[in-house]
């Protein structure tokens, strides 16, 4: 049973939505019964829900000493069984036109988490595993063990996955009173929910770590960085205390969506044995973006223009690529107006350059063509819990140039400096977050493209041979589920 604030494609803000969908499908393929609970947002893509109907109309969720009436709807999202919780209250928790971005987000998702648990209890559902995600549902294990287990719900175990430690749900005591956790002095304890920095605040993510039976994050390297290298944003001591139930599992990507053999968004399909088709897609990308038709490598960036993603180095990659005789393509946008404005300025600056195209915004069809038609994909992140860009790029034979951080370090093996066998090397890696570091890796990629085309082609094939589907992560999560189920 997944309890989640997001699910692709109906309520997608970030990678969390793809993880819940992809993992859920993989677990079902392996013969498990999977259900998903999420809020019934007014902004969902209802055209992606099949057979939506009200299935439970007598759910009263405790809130501020009273109760809020909720309806529960059931429907299928691409075959996944989903329950959608709709509260009927003046707060309009989920009728606001967006998933996040409101001053009371902590209360909205504290309520949703309580509603999900109340639904499981009242509907007589008794899952083996409840899998919750990020701070938005971190109170699920707290509610389970402090409220519902004493009432008799003793069977479920909880796996809590942290997709990004940066956002933790730090707040005051009021949310405890609201949700029925009525002993603030009990929860304001270092071993429970009290924030590690602010003794007058509680930390929802910390509560999830303390109360869950197992805690995962989205790559082994990021798990280590969060615990030991300052990427836990204050939760390092808590992770050390609970290190025996903590680990990392690299996310997968959806091979039905990201598959150059069947992709409907690219003109020529290809695989590792017919890689020549990639060059036709490269020409199609040039034609679409009005780039010069020449022998230069296409270096690209696809993703959010967010400080986490390394904006300064993305900009430098553009200038460096052009200076080294390459072409550069960018597809992305930022919710930050200043960042968007800066890249619009760059777009105007290079508007007449036949070797550069910046597309400010996001276009799913174009993204597929960029992945298929590019030679190199830069991912110079400041920090990166997992990263899907490099996984998709490799699926399409596009060589990743990445910073040695988080999931990037777990998935990209440097062509020149790794001790791994040659057939396992699949990209270029740099360590320091600076221009020299980026140049050291991107320069080697461009030089290999020009000077050793046969080596570059083998590197493309190496990248395509890796399996970054949900096959391995699915088994890893099943192992975790069995481990906590049997304890």
Curated annotation (Swiss-Prot):
Q: What's a single GO MF annotation on this record?
A: alpha-1,4-glucan glucosyltransferase (ADP-glucose donor) activity
Pfam entry (one) = Glycos_transf_1
Q: What class of enzyme is it?
A: transferase
Q: Which Gene3D superfamilies match?
A: Glycogen Phosphorylase B (3.40.50.2000)
Q: Quick one: which pathway?
A: Glycan biosynthesis; glycogen biosynthesis
- Which residues does the annotation say bind ADP-alpha-D-glucose? 12
Please cite one Gene Ontology biological process associated with this protein.
Answer: glycogen biosynthetic process
- Give UniProt keywords alphabetically: Glycogen biosynthesis, Glycosyltransferase, Transferase
Which EC number(s) does the record attach to this protein? 2.4.1.21
Catalytic activity field: [(1->4)-alpha-D-glucosyl](n) + ADP-alpha-D-glucose = [(1->4)-alpha-D-glucosyl](n+1) + ADP + H(+)
HAMAP family named in the record: Glycogen_synth
Q: What does this protein do?
A: Synthesizes alpha-1,4-glucan chains using ADP-glucose.
What's the family? Belongs to the glycosyltransferase 1 family. Bacterial/plant glycogen synthase subfamily.
The name under which this protein is listed is: Glycogen synthase 2
Q: Which organism is it from?
A: Methylococcus capsulatus (strain ATCC 33009 / NCIMB 11132 / Bath)
């Amino acid at each position: 049973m997944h309890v989640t604030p997001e699910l692709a494609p109906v309520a997608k803000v970030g990678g969390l939505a793809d993880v819940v969908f992809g993992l859920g499908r993989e677990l079902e393929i392996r013969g498990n019964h999977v259900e998903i609970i999420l809020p019934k947002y007014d902004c969902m893509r209802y055209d992606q829900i099949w057979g939506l109907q009200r299935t439970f109309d007598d759910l009263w969720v405790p809130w501020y000493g009273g109760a809020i009436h909720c309806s529960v709807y059931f429907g299928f999202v691409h075959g996944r069984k989903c329950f959608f919780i709709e509260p009927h209250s003046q707060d309009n928790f989920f009728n606001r036109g967006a998933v996040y971005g409101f001053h009371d987000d902590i209360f909205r998702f504290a309520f949703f988490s309580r509603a999900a648990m109340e639904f499981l209890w009242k509907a007589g559902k008794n899952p083996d595993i409840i899998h919750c995600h990020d701070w938005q549902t971190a109170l699920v294990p707290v509610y389970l063990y402090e409220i519902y287990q004493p009432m008799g719900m003793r069977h479920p175990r909880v796996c809590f996955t942290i997709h990004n430690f940066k956002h933790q749900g730090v707040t005051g005591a009021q949310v405890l009173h609201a949700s029925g956790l009525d002993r603030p002095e009990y929860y304001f304890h270092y071993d429970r929910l009290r924030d590690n920095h602010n003794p007058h605040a509680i930390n929802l993510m910390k509560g999830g770590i303390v109360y869950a039976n197992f805690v995962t994050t989205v790559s082994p390297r990021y798990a280590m960085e969060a615990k030991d290298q300052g990427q836990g944003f204050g939760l390092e001591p808590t992770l050390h205390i609970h290190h025996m139930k903590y680990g990392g599992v690299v996310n997968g990507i959806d091979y039905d969506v990201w598959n150059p053999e069947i992709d409907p968004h690219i003109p020529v399909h290809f695989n590792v044995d017919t890689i020549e088709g990639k060059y036709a897609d490269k020409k199609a990308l040039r034609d679409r973006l009005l780039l010069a038709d020449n022998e230069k490598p296409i270096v690209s960036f696809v993703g959010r223009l967010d400080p986490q993603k390394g904006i300064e180095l993305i900009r430098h990659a553009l200038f460096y690529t052009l200076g080294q005789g390459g072409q550069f393509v960018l597809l992305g946008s930022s919710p930050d107006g200043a960042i968007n404005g800066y890249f619009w300025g760059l777009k105007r600056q290079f508007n007449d350059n036949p070797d550069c195209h910046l597309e400010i915004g996001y276009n799913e069809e174009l993204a597929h063509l960029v992945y298929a038609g590019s030679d190199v994909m830069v991912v110079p992140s400041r920090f990166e819990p997992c990263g899907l860009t490099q996984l998709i790029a490799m699926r399409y034979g596009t060589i990743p140039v990445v910073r040695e951080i988080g999931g990037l370090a777990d998935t990209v093996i440097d062509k020149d400096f790794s001790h791994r066998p040659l057939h396992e090397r699949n990209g270029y890696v740099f360590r320091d977050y600076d221009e020299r570091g980026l140049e050291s890796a991107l320069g080697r990629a461009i030089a290999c493209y020009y000077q050793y085309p046969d080596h570059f082609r083998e590197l493309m094939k190496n990248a395509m041979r890796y399996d970054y589907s949900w096959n391995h992560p699915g088994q890893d999560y099943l192992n975790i589920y069995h481990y906590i189920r049997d304890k």
